[in-house]
Amino acid sequence: MYPLGRVSLPVRSPVCLFCQNRTSSLLPSAYVWQSARTMASGRLRRKAARMALSPNVAKTSLKKKRNDTDRFGPFAGMNQTEARIRDDPRSRSPASLKRSKAPSDESGRKDSELYKALKMQTALAPIPYGRRSAIKAKIAEITSFDQFPLLPVVRHSIFSQALPGLHDVTPTPIQRVAIPRLLDDTNKDKKPKKRAEGEPEYDQYLLAAETGSGKTLAYLIPLVNTVKQQEAIEKEEQKREEEEKAKEREEKLKNQAFDVEPELPPLSNAGRPRVIILVPTAELVAQVGAKVKTLSHTIKYRSGMISSNLTPRRIKNTLFNPDGIDILVTTPHLLASIAKTEPYVLSRVSHLVLDEADSLLDRSFQPITTEIIEKTSGSLQKLILCSATIPRSLDNFLRKKYPDIQRLTTPNLHAIPRRVQLGVVDIQKDPYRGNRNLACADVIWSIGKAGDSEPAGPFASYQGPSVKKILVFVNEREEADEVAQFLRSKGIDAHSLSRDSSARRQEEILAEFTEAGAPPSSEEIMLAQKKGRQDDAIPFEAPSKPHEPHKLPNTKVLVTTDIASRGIDTLAVKTVILYHVPHTTIDFIHRLGRLGRMNKRGRGIVLVGKKDRKDVVKEVREGMFRGQALI
């Protein structure tokens, strides 16, 4: 036992024990509240302009009405980019302005606010529905391609080459709006407009329509018609020039027989196209180039397509053909690199098309694309921009660079077709329990084992079972190979497609999902009938063919990124699975836009997890059901 003098007594705290416990319990709740407020402010943060669609696509000019709160007060002159100096320095007071205001018209009120979730992510922007109704009434008058002032050979090629096998061929809404304007039949009698100094001397057009609406033919038909007309005019001028040169040559021979100067050879048209169509990817070069080549079989013009997937020798032979070239389909980077060494490539261009303009005028392509436009401005007559989505960044660029651009839009712009159904699968529920790969495989197995929803055609009895083709979109290209490998382990015929895939593999895979099956030939029908008679003549039951266990038959799946979401004409695809919820409504439109093409039905399925924005998916689904634009 220690002596009494050595024992140290504990010092009592001035704060009681209950107060200490209460203070420590309040600290975590404050931290949670601060983190929750940080997350909420992060959700409300506005996204970049390139990821948000413009609300004023169809409006030619913007006149914003300034609020009184912006004009008066201590902070009225802050954050201004323009001077806005009034001619009359005296301004009226708010009271006098309020007294002089006209009575408000309730019928002229603005529409209700945008969907809350879509507005939070700054998604697709609206066109006024009054404008949409006016466009509908205008295009209802056009019901046939015969109403367009086209050359007979061009009109015949639309039915025989561009849209073969269709009995009732009618122009789509964007074709009814764009073809007459691009043919200049509405502006024939108008005097040429005087342009201010610094403004481009060529005409500018913006074609904005929903996915799968025939935008390629909307600009290609007028271009081909113009090429043939220019060809006829040039032949007459060439004939006239040859006659004049022959007369001059005879006069020179008579006057100065020994002082005849040698004539310069005429400038060759090799490597000098009339029309250039720019697209962002090599896959779109192959698709658009094939459509251009198909029309040339009957209309007889020279076309070519070049991309980085081709060899240098083939690019040189295509572009610098001695016979010349009329229409060229390529990418901006390849064309810009060729123009540095061969500047005459852009010296004869009269029409320039930017297909998928929202990509070509994005941050990655904009410097090169604008450089090409400036180099062709000397001979350029028309600049045509074409896109299914108009982001705010593109709209702002066009209003500054081309304020007089003619905006040709359709009523269903920024809307997913109503013939496309959207389903939602919650992967948090049983039996998936958060396993996204398992949910994707189960959905594909359910679709593969189900019957075909479309009615059988007249050749169904002579054809084998139809192969179902499904697209699976992921947000990251690293996950494309992983998801495809997992699906193959579950007995599904799956392939992956991303920017890392080789060019040849990309062409082979896309060919299976873009080419619709042709009807069987007469020989195939005869062989199928003969085989059917032989099977019926056997008196006993034939042994069934052994099937591999756990293999899903007659189903092909392509796991891809946004490389296949823009412009690819996937007519053979009837189902799209969104493995992840898209980041923006722009991606929603382009991914689900692989369905519902050429008035066909389609089905989209979204896999929604714990951290996904279910409110966005819900409002997109409601907007699709109502047929409204995703604004």
UniProtKB/Swiss-Prot annotation:
Location of this chain's protein in the cell: Mitochondrion
Residue span, Helicase C-terminal domain: 442-631
Keyword presence, Mitochondrion: yes
Residue positions binding ATP: 209-216
Top enzyme class: hydrolase
Residues of the transit peptide: 1-39
Stretches assigned to the Helicase ATP-binding domain: 196-408
SMART domains named among the record's database cross-references: DEXDc, HELICc
Enzyme Commission (EC) number: 3.6.4.13
Start-end of Basic and acidic residues biased regions: 102-111
Region of interest: Disordered: 55-111, 181-200
Sequence motif: Q motif, positions: 143-176
One Pfam assignment: Helicase_C
Family: Belongs to the DEAD box helicase family. MRH4 subfamily.
Protein known as: ATP-dependent RNA helicase mrh4, mitochondrial
Organism: Aspergillus terreus (strain NIH 2624 / FGSC A1156)
